[in-house]
Amino acid sequence: MKKFLEKKLKKIAYERIDILMSLAEEEAKKGNWDRAKRYVYLARRIAMKMRIRFPKKWKRRICKKCGTFLLYGRNARVRIKSKRYPHVVITCLECGAIYRIPMIREKKEKRRKKLEERLKAKSNSQTS
């Protein structure tokens, strides 16, 4: 009974987090940055209280340093860099915090293609 109740509570918490974050997005688009920040704060508190992971789609839209909702193009700058390793750089224009998100999927695809090419070349040389 306890596990069932826990699952139900966590599901409700995820729903509330999603609602609060969508409200924060709407308020940020209107220009009410303080209200958006408050909604983000409440959503994070719910996640901490219920000890659940914050959804990834929303986690990247929050500045970890100042807690503002990041609207790309307005209060956040997004750049794609390929130095050292391919990654996306998100800069909060409120506090200047920088977040790097590696583009792992693209790197894995590149490795897979190279491996396939090597295998094809190897099989062609053996058949000749």
Swiss-Prot record:
Keyword Nuclease: yes
EC number of the protein: 3.1.26.5
Top-level taxon: Archaea
Catalyzed reactions: Endonucleolytic cleavage of RNA, removing 5'-extranucleotides from tRNA precursor
Keywords assigned: Cytoplasm, Endonuclease, Hydrolase, Metal-binding, Nuclease, tRNA processing, Zinc
Compartments reported by the entry: Cytoplasm
Entry's Gene Ontology cellular component terms: cytoplasm; ribonuclease P complex
GO molecular function: ribonuclease P activity; zinc ion binding
Cofactor(s) needed by this chain: Zn(2+)
The protein's enzyme class: hydrolase
Binding positions for Zn(2+) per the UniProt entry: 63, 66, 92, 95
Family of this protein: Belongs to the eukaryotic/archaeal RNase P protein component 4 family.
Summary of subunit composition and partner proteins: Consists of a catalytic RNA component and at least 4 protein subunits. Forms a subcomplex with Rnp1 which stimulates the catalytic RNA.
Function of the protein: Part of ribonuclease P, a protein complex that generates mature tRNA molecules by cleaving their 5'-ends.
The name this protein goes by in its record: Ribonuclease P protein component 4
